[in-house]
């Protein structure tokens, strides 16, 4: 089979690999079912929780029926377990950044929400996705990969 077309690269800030800059809190400037799939890495934890449902509904709208979406995001449950396992007073700057900021490499690069695997499944299912599966990131136990499929409807 052919590789799925995961272009264009859409972001809310310009960059060398960005094809479209748009406000991801608004309706996407794409037709219904325009894309064969979506791949997103470390984006949704930077969105406001109140806008996340609309964002996921837009992702559902722009992918073709039976298509898959893949999201890599922080696993807040595993992050909290990691912090809880540390001795009192042993937290450092990296621990705080893990929960609240990701990598503070630019202004506004903060986490506005977080997900346990169960919460992620619920949000994706509420947006209409089916077959929602959560995988541990192979290189980082405190991150997860969300795979979900759009149904025929």
Predicted features and spans:
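Conserved SAM-binding loop
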Residues: 1-81, 146-151
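S-adenosyl-L-methionine-dependent methyltransferase catalytic module, highlighting the catalytic core
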Residues: 50-64, 68-153
């Amino acid at each position: 089979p052919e590789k799925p077309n995961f272009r264009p690269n859409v972001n809310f800030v310009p960059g060398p690999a960005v094809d479209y800059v748009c406000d991801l809190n608004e309706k996407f400037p794409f037709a219904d079912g325009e894309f064969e799939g979506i791949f997103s890495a470390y984006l949704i934890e930077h969105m406001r929780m109140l806008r996340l449902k609309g964002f996921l509904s837009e992702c559902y709208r722009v992918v073709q029926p039976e298509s898959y979406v893949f999201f890599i995001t922080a696993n807040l449950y595993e992050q909290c377990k990691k912090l809880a396992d540390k001795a009192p007073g042993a937290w450092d700057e990296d621990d705080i950044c893990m929960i609240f900021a990701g990598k503070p490499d630019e202004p506004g690069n903060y986490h506005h929400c977080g997900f346990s695997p169960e919460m992620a499944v619920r949000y994706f299912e509420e947006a209409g996705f089916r077959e929602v599966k959560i995988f541990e990131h192979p290189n980082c136990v405190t991150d997860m990969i969300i795979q979900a499929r759009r149904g025929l409807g």
